[in-house]
Swiss-Prot record:
Mainly expressed in small intestine. Detected in the small intestine in a proximal-to-distal gradient that correlated with fat absorption pattern. Present not only in the villi, but also in the crypt regions of the small intestine, which suggests that expression occurs prior to the maturation of enterocytes. Not detectable in other sections of the digestive tract, including stomach, cecum, colon and rectum, or other tissues such as kidney, liver and adipocytes (at protein level). Also detected in kidney, adipose and stomach. Expressed at very low level in liver, skeletal muscle and spleen. The keyword Kinase does not apply. This is 2-acylglycerol O-acyltransferase 2. The gene is Mogat2. It comes from the Eukaryota. The lineage of its organism: Eukaryota, Metazoa, Chordata, Craniata, Vertebrata.
Amino acid sequence: MVEFAPLLVPWERRLQTFAVLQWVFSFLALAQLCIVIFVGLLFTRFWLFSVLYATWWYLDWDKPRQGGRPIQFFRRLAIWKYMKDYFPVSLVKTAELDPSRNYIAGFHPHGVLAAGAFLNLCTESTGFTSLFPGIRSYLMMLTVWFRAPFFRDYIMSGGLVSSEKVSADHILSRKGGGNLLAIIVGGAQEALDARPGAYRLLLKNRKGFIRLALMHGAALVPIFSFGENNLFNQVENTPGTWLRWIQNRLQKIMGISLPLFHGRGVFQYSFGLMPFRQPITTIVGKPIEVQMTPQPSREEVDRLHQRYIKELCKLFEEHKLKFNVPEDQHLEFC
């Protein structure tokens, strides 16, 4: 039976719902819409607009691999505050970050739509720069999304950058420090395991970010986002099922995963693509000091990788009881 939302809802909550609705639309369909508009304009009297943009696009092609184009005005827009209050989302600091250093932050888990990563690291809705003065945050995103006209400029405004190695090298090589490059380590594939109560992380063989940290001497910061997996339900797709096989194949072909998720609707609570109103608390752990090693050996990478996993588990265990995680629940790695 469908459970409808009440008619008399405070304007504050309506604005929160609208803020999340536009974000879900942006995540699922804005890139495709931008491509349609770009091509469509070529067949109208406004064709010159697309031609001029194409020229700009050509000249600006490498920008996503060169730190992007973060705009503070965009990051501070009121709409992100409303989106943050919808869940709500909060950011917790457990240690100081020295603004003279550069950092690689591993963000866990991905969730379905990475709401916590976006709000905490690409907007000022949770006060990132107030908690970590002198630190500029960047978040890596699949390169394919920067191939969409107009959309690329939109996502770069929040501090999103291409997930290529050259992009990471550019940010981590900046003199003077103060840069935090966040990587959702589990990536698109981990989204296929995002469901309420899931604590399975795709990390066991993900060592590229460890190698980057060693090559640049960037401190590693583990981040765990409690509640990230509680925003949506997902159609059963355990490994070995035909659905999971199809999803894995599509992920290898396209580079993006296609989780069959569902949440609530705008006017009812029973079904839809809107996330549930579930709190997200993102805990930023203590940085792990890393000695610069321009050409790290496999043993050095493995050693630091194990230390990172140990610190991530410690962070999870220290805080899990505050968020109603069972005492016997531990992180699982695959």
